[in-house]
């Protein structure tokens, strides 16, 4: 389970869907996330601890209903766990810093990695590269 609090963003500040996704390994409804159609340049961070996770230039429209990226900012930004729930095998992704649940990674993404990091908007915040504005997912 993800850590309940962090110095930058205590879990008590999370709304219901953000808490469900990040702390209870939940999934937001497809096509419902605030950051799904975001096309601005910047950095996507973990909502719970503000750790950088993905650059906007690795984001693409996979058509799956959740923000999709083909690579994280670094190898240690993401923690990978086997997930055998729902009678299938998947690879869960969590924040490498605070262990918040982010989503799953699949081997059907574009080059150069061939991976699709399928991430819940509710687990992310976005920092605009032009003006520094932050948007919580």
From Swiss-Prot:
Its cellular-component GO annotations read: cytoplasm
Reactions accelerated catalytically = L-methionyl-[protein] + [thioredoxin]-disulfide + H2O = L-methionyl-(R)-S-oxide-[protein] + [thioredoxin]-dithiol
The free-text cofactor remark is: Binds 1 zinc ion per subunit. The zinc ion is important for the structural integrity of the protein.
EC numbers listed for it are: 1.8.4.12
One MF annotation (Gene Ontology) recorded for this entry: peptide-methionine (R)-S-oxide reductase activity
SUPFAM superfamilies assigned: Mss4-like
Going by the entry's taxonomy, the superkingdom of the source organism is recorded as Bacteria
**Gene Ontology terms: biological process:** protein repair; response to oxidative stress
**What are the UniProt keywords, alphabetically?**
Metal-binding, Oxidoreductase, Zinc
Residues involved in Zn(2+) binding: 46, 49, 95, 98
Q: Which InterPro entries match?
A: Met_Sox_Rdtase_MsrB, Met_Sox_Rdtase_MsrB_dom, Mss4-like_sf
Gene3D superfamilies from the UniProt entry: Peptide methionine sulfoxide reductase
Q: Does the keyword Oxidoreductase apply?
A: yes
Pfam families the UniProt entry points to: SelR
What PROSITE patterns does the database record attribute to this sequence? Answer: MSRB (PS51790)
Q: Domain MsrB, which positions?
A: 7-129
Tell me the active site: 118 (nucleophile)
Q: Which cofactor does it need?
A: Zn(2+)
Its family remark reads:
Belongs to the MsrB Met sulfoxide reductase family.
What is the protein name for this chain? Peptide methionine sulfoxide reductase MsrB
